């Protein structure tokens, strides 16, 4: 392993983490702007041009706030909870293929922190660990509302992970791989998986809302019942970590949706661009294409938040266990039959 490879990977890893954090930060600004647009308001417009410096102002505010710690028997777990939630949100970005290779300085640089064969399985494993961050934070807060919110979040996320995993089986039966890069490469042009697996896409999209605790599945932190949910007792940057993790998860789930079902970094005419314009230009445009798809899904997340009311908890569980899981199993059966008959 030469030093150039170590430097290359270090730069890519730092860039990927920086991109994830930057998108999570500016998603807060976008959320407020989208809410203002849908409610016929202006939104944040004081800090910088168009309010573009508002995320920095919010970050400084959180840094400067006083930290309150409840009278809890385990202060270590109170600190570990938000750290786990934040860490798992960033770790999932490591296997996302942000584009194809760039040829720079005589080397082929992969726009991915690491390319592993079981990337999809890695994402499911890391996301499941994120449940511990919420559960530990709620339990260590020594507050009944925090604990109730944490239990809700844990049961919701575990329940919808089942449906999400089953929705992926039908897609994996078609692609034959767990590698996100290979799945993306198979969708060159407009050969997108969403046209072949619309049911898997719909189930995965609904489960993504539940996994990120977004409206209409934000039962873990609904203000009318649980004050602030599992982060009721948190303040300053500990609370900021929980909020940051939510937007980072929203960004990563949007990237996964774009890669699995909408071609990832592929776009119509990409092969022509490679042959006639150049590999680097074509692949930079591929990164921009993926970024546009991700922004489209992020806007959809925010649009849904301000247009659809919150479900009741029994409706949430009914949808997950009695509708989505049977539908995902039926989709697996239909996909298997179609592969046997037509492939």
From Swiss-Prot:
Major site of localization recorded for this protein: membrane
Q: Name one Pfam family in it.
A: NADHdh
Entry keyword set: Cell inner membrane, Cell membrane, Membrane, NAD, Quinone, Translocase, Transmembrane, Transmembrane helix, Ubiquinone
The protein's location, in the record's own words, is: Cell inner membrane
Q: What is this protein called?
A: NADH-quinone oxidoreductase subunit H
- Name the PROSITE patterns on file: COMPLEX1_ND1_1, COMPLEX1_ND1_2
What molecular function terms (GO) are annotated for this protein?
Answer: NADH dehydrogenase activity; oxidoreductase activity, acting on NAD(P)H, quinone or similar compound as acceptor; quinone binding
An example Gene Ontology biological process: aerobic respiration
Q: How does it sit in the membrane?
A: Multi-pass membrane protein
The organism's superkingdom is given as: Bacteria
């Amino acid at each position: 392993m030469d030093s150039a490879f170590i430097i290359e990977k270090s730069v890519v890893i730092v860039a990927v983490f920086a991109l994830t954090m930057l998108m999570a930060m500016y998603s807060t600004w976008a959320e407020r702007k989208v809410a203002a647009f849908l409610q016929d308001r202006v939104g944040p417009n004081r800090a910088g041009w168009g309010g573009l410096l508002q995320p920095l102002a919010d970050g400084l505010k959180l840094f400067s706030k006083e930290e309150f710690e409840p009278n809890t028997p385990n202060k270590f777990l109170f600190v570990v909870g938000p750290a786990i939630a934040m860490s798992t949100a960033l770790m999932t970005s490591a296997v996302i293929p942000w584009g194809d290779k760039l040829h720079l300085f005589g080397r082929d640089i992969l726009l991915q922190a690491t390319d592993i064969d079981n990337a999809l399985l890695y994402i499911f494993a890391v996301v499941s660990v994120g449940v511990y961050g919420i559960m530990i934070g709620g339990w260590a807060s020594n507050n009944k509302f925090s604990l109730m919110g944490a239990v809700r979040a844990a049961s919701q996320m575990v329940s919808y992970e089942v449906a999400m995993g089953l929705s992926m089986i039908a897609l994996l039966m078609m692609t034959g791989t767990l590698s996100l890069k290979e799945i993306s490469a198979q969708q060159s042009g407009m050969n997108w998986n969403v046209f072949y697996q619309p049911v898997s896409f719909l189930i995965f999209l609904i489960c993504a809302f539940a996994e990120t605790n977004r409206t209409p599945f934000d039962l873990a932190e609904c203000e009318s019942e649980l004050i602030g949910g599992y982060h009721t007792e948190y303040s300053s940057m500990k609370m900021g970590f929980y909020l940051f993790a939510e937007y980072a998860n929203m960004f990563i789930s949007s990237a996964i949706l774009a890669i699995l079902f909408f071609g990832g970094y592929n776009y119509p005419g990409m092969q022509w661009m490679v042959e006639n314009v150049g590999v680097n230009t074509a692949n930079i445009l591929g990164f921009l294409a993926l970024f546009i798809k991700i922004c489209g899904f992020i806007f959809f997340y925010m649009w849904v938040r301000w247009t659809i009311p919150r479900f009741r908890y029994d409706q949430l569980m009914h949808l997950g266990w009695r509708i989505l899981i049977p539908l995902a199993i039926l989709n697996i059966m239909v996909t298997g039959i179609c592969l046997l008959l037509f492939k």
